From Swiss-Prot:
Its cofactor is [4Fe-4S] cluster. This is Lipoyl synthase. Pathway: Protein modification; protein lipoylation via endogenous pathway; protein N(6)-(lipoyl)lysine from octanoyl-[acyl-carrier-protein]: step 2/2. Residues 67-281 form the Radical SAM core domain. It is an enzyme of class 2 (transferase). Its EC number is 2.8.1.8. It is found in: Cytoplasm. Gene3D superfamilies: Aldolase class I (3.20.20.70). Transmembrane segments: none annotated. Belongs to the radical SAM superfamily. Lipoyl synthase family. [4Fe-4S] cluster 2 binds at C81, C85, C88. The gene is lipA. Signal peptide: none annotated.
Amino acid sequence: MAVAPNGRRLLRIEARNAQTPIEAKPRWIRTTATMGPEFRDMKKRVKGAGLHTVCQEAGCPNIHECWEDREATFLIGGDTCSRRCDFCDIKSGRPEPLDEDEPRRVAENVREIGLRYSTITGVTRDDLPDEGAWLYAEVVRQIHKLNPNTGVENLTPDFSGKPDLLQTVFEARPEVFAHNLETVPRIFKRIRPAFRYERSLDVIRQARDFGLVTKSNLILGMGETVDEVKSAMRDLRDAGCDILTVTQYLRPSNLHHPIERWVKPEEFVMYRDYGHDIGFAGVMAGPLVRSSYRAGRLYAQAIKARGEELPANLQHLGEGIDDTASQEASTLLSKYGASRETPVGAR
């Protein structure tokens, strides 16, 4: 019987994944830590108040850039997800009871850090009657109440696609409602067995119909083809998705889905251009782009592309929106030059 380091019996899919060693990364997957004044101030505030962000706890490679923009991400609902996706490092199982004071604490953390834009994400809570809908909505309400000049992006699970639960979340009116599709139909069931491709598209559609700015993410390198990625992008756009991020899959451990290929920066540039061609208001694509990467700036870019004005209380998000982010594929091409094909191999 195969077991994990903590003594837990491995799932069959984990045992199969573990047969493939962790892969060596290509040269373009790297970051440079630049500690500017805003980053240093945020780090001091976070440490002084004993606060915790996903940015730190997940060891995000983009923390220096996002914190310099006064942006951060918070994980809500506990540290245990009621579903398991084959790419995700969050543990799955039966979650702890809901902490109803969490929304207030998160809002106070946002105020203490002095964020300009905050992303809220969290685990799936199928164990709760409302699947956590109240929690996701209440965090947005509390942040807006205590931080009227802070934008909020709400990255949520699908709430089983139930209109009444989604309505609860929509009515909190985040600046951006995000739900990540993540992959293409052919491999969706293996990668996200507890989710449904069409249901995720319908979540985006319902948010669009409510009048929210919508966002999603695609992870590449798990076995999809170029044509399948383009088709998924069209599906998202047809569902009413406004903003899209496209990223490279990085394997959290050998128990997770093996990396099928390293997507070159040139291909990410192609997806960015294709996304704009088919009508996305904002597209960010690159190997180390993540769904919350430079989220405030991407929101501001999307509002501008739609020919709209940022709300008066969020005008500050429009500063420097035309600058290229360091993890965008076009920046990597300028820095490293054309990419050679890099086969996937053990490190």
